[in-house]
A protein has these predicted regions:
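Cationic, low-complexity basic patches in intrinsically disordered or flexible, solvent-exposed regions
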Residues: 4, 10
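A cross-family phosphate/adenosyl-ligand binding-site feature
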Residues: 33-129, 167-202, 209
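Short, structured loop/turn "capping" segments at alpha-beta junctions
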Residues: 92, 156-160
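Active-site/ligand-binding-proximal alpha/beta "capping" segment
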Residues: 123-155, 163
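Short loop-to-beta-strand entry elements in the cores of soluble alpha/beta enzymes
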Residues: 160-168
Length: 212
């Protein structure tokens, strides 16, 4: 987990002992705290079930003891997600490019706000912070973000679950496209093995191994 990243720099016997002891204690409790990076739209959309589902997702992140990483905006579905996660006690990290800050899009009350110079740096930082990735319904920006995650998974540059929240069939077309890529020999099941589709929050819990 991210709490033990210091071991990459200077592992020693004491540090390894602490790590192993901590992992054992966490396993006894059956829970690993995750930074869950969520990609989603800054608009509401015209399906009222989106807001209800995103608030449910935010509440679960907080109530389960996990932390949220998202794009930092107060607008639309992004704002609803952050507000519900904060209300449920989650640590919430927003990652926003500086030109959004100047336009006052940032959410108030975040645990941490990270400002990046541009969109590419924002994508990099959100991946760097995440232990798991969820793509909620969103627009082309959301598609760009989750596509980079899938690409890095295929190249084995990261190793983490990537869940596309197929709410009301929103990502059915993308699911079919990914399958078609395999059929046409342009991708493989191995390259897509970390990519999953969830129909509801229960599916997400099961995929992330956090069903309680």
């Amino acid at each position: 987990m991210r709490e033990f990243s210091f071991l990459r720099k200077s592992p020693d016997c004491v540090s390894v002992f602490i790590l192993l002891y901590s992992i054992e204690e966490i396993r006894k409790g059956g829970f690993f705290r995750m930074n869950i990076t969520v990609y989603l739209g800054a608009n509401e959309g015209n399906d009222t079930s989106f807001r209800q589902a995103v608030e449910e997702l935010g509440r679960w992140i907080g109530e389960s003891g996990n932390a949220l990483v998202y794009g930092g905006s107060k607008s639309g579905l992004m704002g609803a997600l952050a507000a519900s996660a904060l209300a449920a006690g989650a640590e919430v990290t927003g990652v926003e490019p500086e030109f959004f800050i100047s336009e006052s899009f940032q959410m108030e009350g975040l645990t941490e706000l990270i400002v990046t110079k541009d969109i590419p740096e924002r994508r990099t930082k959100m991946i760097e912070l995440g232990d798991a990735f969820i793509a909620f319904p969103g627009g082309t920006g959301t598609l760009e973000e989750v596509s980079e995650v899938m690409s890095k998974l295929a190249l084995k540059q990261i190793d983490a679950p990537c869940v596309l929240y197929n709410l009301n069939g929103y990502y059915a077309g993308l699911k079919a496209l990914l399958r078609h890529m395999v059929e046409m020999g342009l991708s493989t099941e191995e390259k897509q093995e970390k990519v999953s589709f969830a129909e509801n929050l229960g599916d997400i819990k099961a995929i992330l191994g956090a069903e309680k």
